């Protein structure tokens, strides 16, 4: 179960790295990022950060264009996001999955880590 405890140093480092990458690729970063780490699962929830152009598209019922564009950008920055998580945690990332909720201006980055060696 994901915790709602205050962010740990690794969670904060990952949040900051993911926010920086989103700002670099999108031109505007999220207003809030929360990262939860639980075993092999790392979940980053990003709130806010839609550009004025994206807001306009959403307001004119073209949110699907925003979602497709965001997903493309998330795929483009995927290797760098994986590198950031691996660097902070010292563990390989097995998988990265991204999703967007345009209506609520939310994005999520889900990383699945390789199991720890015993």
PLM ranges: what are they?
Residues 1-118:
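Interaction-mediating elements
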């Amino acid at each position: 179960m994901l915790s709602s405890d205050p962010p740990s140093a690794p969670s904060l480092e990952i949040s900051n790295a993911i926010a920086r990458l989103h700002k670099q690729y999108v031109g505007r970063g999220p207003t809030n990022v929360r990262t939860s780490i639980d075993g092999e699962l790392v979940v980053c929830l990003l709130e806010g950060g839609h550009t004025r152009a994206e807001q306009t598209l959403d307001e004119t019922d073209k949110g699907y264009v925003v979602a497709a564009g965001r997903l493309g950008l998330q795929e483009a920055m995927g290797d760098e996001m994986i590198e950031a998580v691996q660097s902070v945690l010292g563990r390989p990332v097995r998988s990265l999955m991204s999703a967007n909720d345009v209506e609520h201006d939310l994005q999520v980055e889900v990383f699945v880590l390789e199991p720890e060696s015993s």
